[in-house]
C-alpha cells in the first residue's frame, strides 16, 4: 500500500508539471501575457483607473442623465474620452515609451475626444445649460496630463480651477432651487480631485511606461488602442499569422524590388550614365531662342495643378457668422456684430440676461433693468447699461469699455486685456473682481469729469507667522 501511495503522489506531481508546461507553451511569445508582473491581467495603475471610472465618472454620468438634454449628451462624450484614456494607459502598461515622432499619433484618439467636447459647447451657446457645458469644456483638457512632465498633477488642478469658474455660476443659479445641479457639480469636480490623487500615486513625475515589452508605436499599439476600454481581457490565445495588410505590403515590396534594382543599376553606372543623354542643338536652347522662352512660360502653368486643392481643410476661409440680436426665452443674444454703433435693447425685464459674444468694434446700449450681462470673446466693444441686479462679467475679451448709468453690485473681469469701467454716482459701491487680466481702469465721477484709477495687477505676499498676507505691490516710477 505504501508503494501504491507513493506512486500516486508521483503521478500527481507529474501531471501538475505537464499542465504548467502546457500553459507555458500556449502563452504568446515575449511579455505580452505578463503586464508589470500580473500574468493574464492588467497593471495596478490600470486597475486604479478602472476604479476611478467605475466610481467618480459613473456617478457624474448618472447625475448628468438625471438633468438630461445637452448635459447628458456632453457627459456621454466625457465618458468616451475617459475610455480613450483608459486604452492609452493600458497600452503604456504593456509597451515601452514610444519614439518622439510617434507620440502625437498615439495621443490623437484622446485629443479628438477633447476637441469634440469643446466643439459641442461652442455649437450650443444658446443652451439653458451653457454654464454646465462651459465647466466641462474648459476643464476637459486635463486629460492631456499624460503628455505633461515632470508634474502632471498640478496641470490637472489648473484645469479643475478653470471649471470652478463656471460651476460656481451653476451653484449660484440652482443651490436654492434645484439640488440636482448641486449634485452634478460635486460629482464633476470629484473626478478631477480623484484624478489628481491617482496621478500622485501612479504617475507622480509623468506617465509611467512599461520597462519591458516592445516599444510603443502606431503599428504595435493598434490592437491595444482599438480593443476599447472594456473589462480586462483574459490571457490572449496563441498569436495568429501576420495580418493581411502586412502581407499586402510585403507583396508590394516584392513587386517594386525589380524597379529598385533597375534604379540602383543606373545609379551605379557613375559617369557612364551621361552617355545616354541626347545632344541639344542651339535651336533647341531657350536662352538662344526667344520663341521657346515664351512657350516655356506657358508650359510651366500646368504645374499649378499640383498645388493643394482649395477644398483642403487647411485652406478653408474663416466661417462668417450671421449677426444676431434677438430674445431667446429670457436671454438676449447679441452675437457676431461688427462695426455697429447703433445696437439698442430697450424692452427689458428683471429676469432677463444679456449674452454678448464675439462682437467687434461695436457699441451696445441696454435700457431698463436686467438680471445679468456677460461679455464673452469680444474686441473693442462699448457697453452702456442702466441697471443690473446681479453681475456683469467680462471674459476672454480685449479693449472693453463699460459705462454704468444706474447701479450694479458686481463686475467680474477674467482673462481680459484692456477694460475701462465708468461708474455712476449710484454705482460707487460696486465690487470689482478680476483675475488673469491686465490694463484695467475704474473711472470715478468727480467735479463733472472722471478720474481714472488703475486696478492693481501686481501683488506681493508675505507670511506673518500665522497666515499669508497679500497686498498690491507699489511700483515706484
Swiss-Prot record:
PTM sites of type N-acetylalanine: 2
Coiled coil: none
Superkingdom of source: Eukaryota
Family annotation (SMART domains): CARP
Protein's cellular compartments: Cell membrane
Gene Ontology annotations for the cellular component aspect, listed alphabetically: cytoplasm; plasma membrane
Tagged with keyword Transport: no
GO molecular function: actin binding; adenylate cyclase binding
Region of interest: Disordered: 224-261, 274-323
Membrane topology value: Peripheral membrane protein
Pfam families referenced in this protein's UniProt entry, alphabetically: CAP_C, CAP_N, CAP_N-CM
InterPro entries registered for this protein in UniProt: Adenylate_cyclase-assoc_CAP, Adenylate_cyclase-assoc_CAP_C, Adenylate_cyclase-assoc_CAP_N, C-CAP_CF_C-like, CAP/MinC_C, CAP_C_sf, CAP_CS_C, CAP_CS_N
Residues annotated with Phosphoserine modification: 301, 309
Similarity comment text for this entry: Belongs to the CAP family.
Protein name, entry field: Adenylyl cyclase-associated protein 2
The organism of origin for this protein: Pongo abelii (Sumatran orangutan)
